[in-house]
Amino acid sequence: WYQRQITDRKTPFTLKGGGTKMIPIARPRIVVEGGEVFYIFRDEERGSRVSMAHASDVGISKWTITDLTDFSVDAWEPSHDTELWKEQRKLHLFVQHTRQGDGERTAEIDPQMVYVLETDMNINK
């Protein structure tokens, strides 16, 4: 196991209180092949864009971060086509602009388009 800090977040947040919480960072999706790691996330500090951190060797490489969208996806949580990754090493992300209310409140939002973001695996090399 390796323990590495990927970003240097500054915004504090808490999960205290009742109900679900709108947090400023998504739970990441981590995709690995050998020692190479792709860390897909959304962070309010980066404009809530779809972002990807990459290390060619998790043990020694410096992380590079790239925003994969130039627009906010608000409360989006990463997900990818796991079988396409396993079979063809293609990283395709399911993306939809979403919102989440705080403390079991709903957030008003019109229906949003759903799309597949096909990443360029050489983007950070």
Q: What is each residue range found by the language model?
A:
Residues 1-125:
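Extracellular, repeat-based ectodomains that mediate carbohydrate processing or recognition
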